């Protein structure tokens, strides 16, 4: 197996580790790292939670014999940071530990990094290889990449439908929906919720189903709830307004909305063709990277 093939093997392990941070690190990206000495992994780590140490720090700190680091290769799925944020620059730690070779899956498009991590390492005389499993590394963080590059949230549309294309029957308010999804798919949906930053429904879904839009069948956080309600038709006693969790209501600029609890924020945007661009811009401003649309 040549060096490039070996690099791919260890980068795949970085991706496995990085995925363990799913649902816990946003708005940061998921990142995994391994430290390799003479073909053997002697340390590994991943970014576990937003605000906590990055993957490179955890991987380096997990090495029992720090004296081996000047003989090691560090693999990391995303370019090491080069700026001060909630944690110090990972690039500086790598230089300090005298690690001679670093293999990077993909560059970080975040403006404060954007290639500067690689520059910092190379200026210190470190061999840097980039682009190993690059597409896989980008795909893992597609929500982060979309937000940084396109300056909008990544949007996931979710629905359940019958084989012949129906999603529900015609029903009066208060009538239960016909259940199409099963228990397994319901758990999967709640996993999606735990991984999303926000979840959105329209007026009809909010009125007909009175959903909670919380994460209950999977571990993790509940997303920010967003209700599109142009004409204030959603009852003020709905679950999304009364359970004390944070919700946003998007309504028209001239709509008079009833007084709601402090946990509910009312945002006024122009509806029509400008609604989606305006909504995505508002969510980007709030650092929402992944929007799940459920109805």
Write out the residue ranges for each language-model feature.
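Short beta-strand scaffold segments in enzyme catalytic cores
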Residues: 31-39, 158-160
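Short, basic/aromatic recognition patches
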Residues: 6-26, 147
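Zn2+-dependent cytidine deaminase-like catalytic core
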Residues: 35-138, 224, 253-255
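Glycine-rich beta-strand-to-loop/alpha-helix junction loops that act as flexible
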Residues: 31-32, 203-204, 294-295
């Amino acid at each position: 197996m040549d060096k490039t093939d070996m690099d791919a093997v260890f980068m795949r392990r970085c991706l496995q580790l990085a995925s363990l941070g799913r649902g816990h690190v946003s708005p940061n990206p998921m990142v995994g790292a391994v430290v390799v000495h003479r073909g053997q992994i002697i340390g590994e780590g991943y970014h576990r939670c937003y605000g906590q140490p990055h993957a490179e720090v955890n991987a380096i700190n997990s090495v029992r014999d720090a004296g081996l680091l000047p003989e090691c290769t560090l693999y990391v799925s995303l370019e090491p940071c080069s700026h001060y944020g909630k944690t110090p620059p990972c690039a500086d730690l790598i230089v300090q530990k005298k690690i001679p070779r670093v293999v990077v899956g993909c560059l970080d498009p975040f403006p404060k990094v954007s290639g500067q991590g690689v520059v910092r390492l190379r200026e210190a005389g470190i061999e840097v290889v980039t682009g190993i499993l690059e597409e896989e590394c980008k795909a893992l963080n597609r929500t982060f990449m979309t937000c940084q590059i396109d300056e909008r949230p990544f949007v996931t549309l979710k629905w359940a439908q019958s084989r012949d294309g129906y999603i529900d029957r015609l029903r009066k308010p208060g009538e239960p929906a016909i259940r199409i999804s099963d228990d397994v798919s319901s758990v999967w949906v709640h996993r999606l919720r735990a991984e999303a930053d926000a979840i959105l429904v329209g007026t009809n879904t909010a009125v007909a189903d009175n959903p909670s839009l919380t994460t209950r069948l999977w571990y993790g956080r509940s997303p920010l709830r967003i209700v599109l309600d142009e004409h204030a038709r959603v009852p003020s006693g709905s679950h999304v307004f009364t359970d004390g969790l944070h919700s946003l209501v998007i309504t028209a600029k001239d709509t008079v909305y009833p007084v709601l609890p402090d946990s509910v924020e009312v945002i006024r945007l122009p509806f029509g063709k400008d609604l989606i661009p305006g909504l995505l811009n508002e969510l980007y401003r709030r650092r929402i990277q992944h929007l799940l649309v459920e109805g």
